[in-house]
């Protein structure tokens, strides 16, 4: 699952509560760089607010 805020897709991350995706209204997406992302894609982490 993923949540969306401002049109950005967020992947699961340890910053999520209970490892679940936050409701869209509470999803805060932040772009993060993954040095070891072999796909070279931008990753987004999701944090509950």
Swiss-Prot record:
Disulfide bonds join 3-22, 10-27, 21-48, 29-46. Keywords: Calcium channel impairing toxin, Disulfide bond, Ion channel impairing toxin, Knottin, Neurotoxin, Secreted, Toxin, Voltage-gated calcium channel impairing toxin. GO terms for molecular function: calcium channel regulator activity; toxin activity. It is found in: Secreted. Expressed by the venom gland. Its main location: secreted. GO terms for cellular component: extracellular region. The keyword DNA damage does not apply. It comes from the Eukaryota. Negative results: this toxin does not inhibit sodium and potassium channels. The presence of a 'disulfide through disulfide knot' structurally defines this protein as a knottin. Potent and selective blocker of N-type voltage-gated calcium channels (Cav2.2/CACNA1B). Also blocks vertebrate Cav2.1/CACNA1A (P/Q-type) and Cav1.2/CACNA1C (L-type) channels at very high concentration (2 micromolar). This is Omega-segestritoxin-Sf1a. It comes from Segestria florentina (Tube-web spider).
């Amino acid at each position: 699952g993923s949540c969306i805020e401002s049109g950005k897709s967020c992947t699961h991350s340890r910053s999520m509560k209970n490892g679940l995706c936050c409701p869209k209204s509470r999803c805060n997406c932040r772009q993060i760089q993954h040095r070891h992302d072999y796909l070279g894609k931008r990753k987004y982490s999701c944090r509950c607010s």
